[in-house]
Amino acid sequence: MKLTCVLIIAVLFLTACQLATAKTYSTGRQKHRALRSTDKNIKLSRRCNDPGGSCTRHYHCCQLYCNKQESVCLENEPAF
């Protein structure tokens, strides 16, 4: 009986901690940096090329402008 009560209290405590962390995460304030390590991994895997770098698609370039004929990232939107 005592073990059951301890387990129930532990589960309730862990649930409350998760809800508090989720609320903090959703408002933009962050108390626990390790919880957002997945965001950091996503940003590191999505690198872009500076103007003059090579590209095959617009999202390869930081400015989102790719001259596909020359396969070069542009600094500004191309003039048509």
UniProtKB/Swiss-Prot annotation:
Domain notes: The presence of a 'disulfide through disulfide knot' structurally defines this protein as a knottin. The cysteine framework is VI/VII (C-C-CC-C-C).
Protein name as annotated: Conotoxin Bt6.5
Keyword set includes Transferase: no
Organism the protein comes from: Conus betulinus
One Pfam family here: Conotoxin
Source taxon at top rank: Eukaryota
Main localization category: secreted
Primary role: When injected intracranially in mice, induces a series of symptoms such as quivering, climbing, scratching, barrel rolling and paralysis of limbs. Unexpectedly, no effect is observed on ionic currents when tested on locust DUM neuron.
